[in-house]
Amino acid sequence: MKKSIVSVLLLAITFGFFGKSKAQEKDSLYEARKLKIDEINFVSGYYTQEGEHSSIGGGKGDEALTNISNSIQVRLLKNSQKYEHRLDVAVAVDHHTSASTKLINNVPDGSPTNIYSGKISAKTAASSGTSGVTGASSKFVGWRIYPSINYFAKNLERNTTYGIGAYYSREFDYQSIGGELSFVKASQDNNAEFSVKAMAFFDQRLEILPVELRPVNTGVNNKKADDDEDEHEGNDDNYKLWNKNSYSVNFAYSQIINPRLQVSLLADFAFQDGLLSIPYNRVYFTNNTVSSEKLPMQRMKIPLGMRLNYFLGETFIFRTYYRYFFDDWGIKAHTAQLEIPIKISPFVSLSPFYRYHHQTSNDYFKPYGQHNPGEKYYSSDYDLSSFNSQNIGLNLHYLPLESKIFKSVDFRYSFYKRSEGLSAHNLTFAITFK
């Protein structure tokens, strides 16, 4: 699912490379305009993957997954003599099917006994009528909805922009509320720009354990009230409800060096606390016991990056990107990307792209059956393992210049391959209406 979201962001960056019109000169007799719809963006994506390291199966099992996503964004503009106001309202819906999801309520073939002592109940969330953050029906499993709203006010005299945004996301076992504040300052000649954005997300996740790890004396099986003083709380369905908070500050500085060369420097600082593990991910130990994934309750992440765009005449643009990432869980990663938009005609451009990623393993990752029972933290999620990945694809951008309805149309395809075996295909279609 994350990769389909990344594709949407990449499309947004690609839009307008060859379709930007020259900025109009300011008129001293400028008149304020009423609120109007500036454009409507529709994006639809299809993502499918295959692999054999299911995290729900403890690092072993079918990872086949299909995700279909659709989003629509309406952009409203209103100009006054001093300010330009912009309001973006969007809603997106995803639906995915996963081969390993059924293993939450079913014991994998050949699975050993659980790490808990005592009798184990095989009563499932579906049979107890509990399957959501607030009691949602099991028919919503696989669905995700995430609306957002963003407002920006640009001071035309000072060339500064202030922004505020709100986000919401909901799945059958997870919900998130977030917000952001942003500030952008551009030079008077628009050759340099500095931006900063602060974001915070407050998430809640139900502690839905694999079926064989649900003791009879807790949670859903005996409807026990939550009257303890631990860091989580119960809900009407008697699943434990855990919190996760995420905070980040993003800095960016861009500079036009000359008419052909533009450079951007990027730095992000992120901190998370709360439940950072996924309760229904299994971990198998060397003594033939099994437990759910357990990771530290805090994490700090710092990505540092740079973009360099070089315009070779009116036909080619070389867009390069590099990022170095590290966190306090032991991961260090390098990512490099090259994209070359090629102007075929005034209406059409093609953009082949290639992305390479290398990362070291998380301190708490081990493959299936290799964790020791005495370890404090453990995970067999291969997203936290050491691997190399490659992503290659092509974007087709079409500008119907004479159309009174369509502003741009994009098709984007990519193929993703990881050294540990995971592979994926991603197809995205985007259209912007005037």
Predicted regions mapped to residue ranges:
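Residues on the lipid-exposed face of transmembrane beta-strands in outer-membrane beta-barrel proteins
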Residues: 72-76, 147-153, 181-185, 251-255, ...
